[in-house]
Amino acid sequence: ILDCESTVALCCRPHGFGKSMNLSMLKCYLERPVPGSSSVNLFIGSQIWDAEDGIYRDEYARYPVIALDFSTSSYRGADVEAAMRDVVARECARLLPLLDVPDLARSDVRHIERVARGVAGSDEIDSALGVLIELLRMACDEQVVLLVDGYDAAFTNHMQAKGAYG
């Protein structure tokens, strides 16, 4: 993935083939820590850390990472839109500390704060991911990494609940 020149990489594997674990590891490696948090580099001495004389070390803890996980069982039978909005709202709350920089548009930051607190309207929630990506890009002056796990889970669970799938 780190060698990929594409802006998007889709990893399609059957259930149980390690997609979630790989995404979790990518998040741990790439994610810029929230200010004030303590972090320990778990990768020192690992293959990725030592590969090709440390070629990937500059990527460590460098990027703002949005990790959307739709694979949890709590979405079984749930409304697909509600499940997606909930996941986005939780990420807004988790990443809000990275937006504590002076040069960001206050109206956009307040937008993300409302989503994070669960008081945003439907339109605000629907646009939150795009706003969050742009704010993180500006706040961190880096590309934003978007990891999506279980992207089909909410839809599949919804269809199974209706008896229309599987």
Spell out what each predicted region is.
Residues 1-6:
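Phosphate-binding P-loop
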Residues 7-25:
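Walker A/P-loop nucleotide-binding motif
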Residues 8-10, 65, 143-145:
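Residue-level preference for the first positions of well-ordered beta-strands
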Residues 22, 28-98:
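P-loop NTPase motor core
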Residues 22-26, 132, 154:
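Structural preference for long, well-ordered alpha-helical segments in enzyme cores
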Residues 35, 80, 126-127, 133-149, ...:
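P-loop NTPase signaling cores
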Residues 49-58, 129-139:
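Conserved alpha-helical scaffold flanking the Walker A/P-loop in AAA+ ATPase domains
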Residues 70-71, 76-126, 154-164:
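Conserved P-loop NTPase mechanochemical-coupling segment
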